[in-house]
Amino acid sequence: MQVSAHTNDVLGELDAVSIGRGISAGDFTAQEAVSAAIARLQSVDPVLHGMVCERFELALAEAAGLPASGSGAPFAGVPSLIKDNTDVAGLPTRQGSAGTSPEPMAEDGDFTRTFRATGLIPIGKSSLPEFGLTATTEPLSRPATRNPWNPAYSTGGSSGGSAALVAAGVVPIAHANDGGGSIRIPAACCGLVGLKPSRGRLPTMAVADKMPINILAEGVVTRSVADTAAFYAAAERHHAPASLMPVGSVTSPGEQRLRIGLCVGHPLAGACDPEVVAQVEQVARQCEALGHGVQPIALPVDRQMADDFFLYWARLAAAMNYLGKMAFGRDFDRRQLEPLTTHLSKHYLWRCWRSPMAIRRLRQFAVNYQALFTELDLVLTPVLATPPVELGYLDPALDFATALERLIRYAAFTPPQNVAGTPAISLPLGRSSDGLPIGVQFAAGMVQERR
């Protein structure tokens, strides 16, 4: 049974661009838009568990403070959410963990400031698995976040709370970030648009910029390509790195004939689910019908690349575990960490001597991956090897070896773009026989989001 608030009121089915225009035109006020979103949240979140803390009164006050025709920002007064691994003044940043402090943050983080500059008003913070370390949103410290298409299924992760509440019609757009697929995977599971932008496109956490390879990208999940494009156009008015070609305003399809590489197999995923393969191949045929060239390719990935990436991923868990007091303050309690985090930490400690060579190989992989785009414009793949999985399949309390193998197979197609720093988007272009969304991924070369 689907869980939806889309038809609770006249605003529930509108996208963010339409709500922003309605506020600007005086059709309704920002306060009415925010109040309606809060009511929609309260109607579905007892089932979905997508929000971890609220700021309803502050959001309503911010909306009331806007001029009747908005502030001039494209999303002025549009209600939204910030993922709970990003600082928002007055709210704690728990990172999906019982080990972090419940004390509120003194100020907004860098990304939050850019997010707010577009006019979006956060009504609260959305759920994630502990430290965003897995592809489902089932933290042990609170109820699992459920998929609005079928609450017995996973939303994906790690931006599962944002995806669930956008898909359910609570808000039209919400913050997400991606260190191995965490924008694209929830978008695929919940039938949304999820773009992981090029490295550096938006401000990330300070710790990410200090990593040997910055695999993290900030972004949003939305219900329309138009909203995603409008968000990046608005955000780069406030954060436009000189080293990156601007995305600019994208309001219509391009006219260029594109060279598309098609890959529906993966050495780590094994044989993908037939429904996933059929959907990706159907999209390839549609691209050919539009005049684009499609050719089969093999991705430059192997088990060594996966082992190197997951060692790097485990390094992040070890940093959270053993350096948590430095990162999160003296109230951090590592005794409260979940089994997946502690096992990943041990995985890294037992193999940390391999880390320098793993990083070197990952950097070479990034070069090899980017080289694909000397002959291609886009690469078309599944987002996930199967349709969304049931809750429990990736439970963080599972035996570690089982959890790791399941995760590697399920999410094999998304880490390459994090290592390479290149953009990739999940598009909701199909459904399984069970009625669950199937996401299709288009990946491009560095700074080629417009394609």
Q: Which residues does each PLM region occupy?
A:
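Short helix-loop capping/hinge segments that flank enzyme active sites or metal/cofactor-binding pockets
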Residues: 3-7, 75-95, 254-263, 314-370, ...
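Short glycine/serine-rich loop segments
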Residues: 107-232, 418-430, 434-439
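Glycine-rich, small-residue loops and helix-cap segments
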Residues: 26, 77, 117, 171-172, ...
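Acidic/His- and Gly-rich active-site-bordering loop/insert found
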Residues: 59-61, 69-141
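An N-terminal boundary/leader segment
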Residues: 1-61, 276, 285, 289-291
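A short acidic, glycine-rich active-site loop
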Residues: 99-105, 150-153, 399-412
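A short helix-breaking turn/cap at a secondary-structure junction
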Residues: 196-283, 301
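Acyltransferase
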Residues: 27-35, 64, 272-298, 321-331, ...
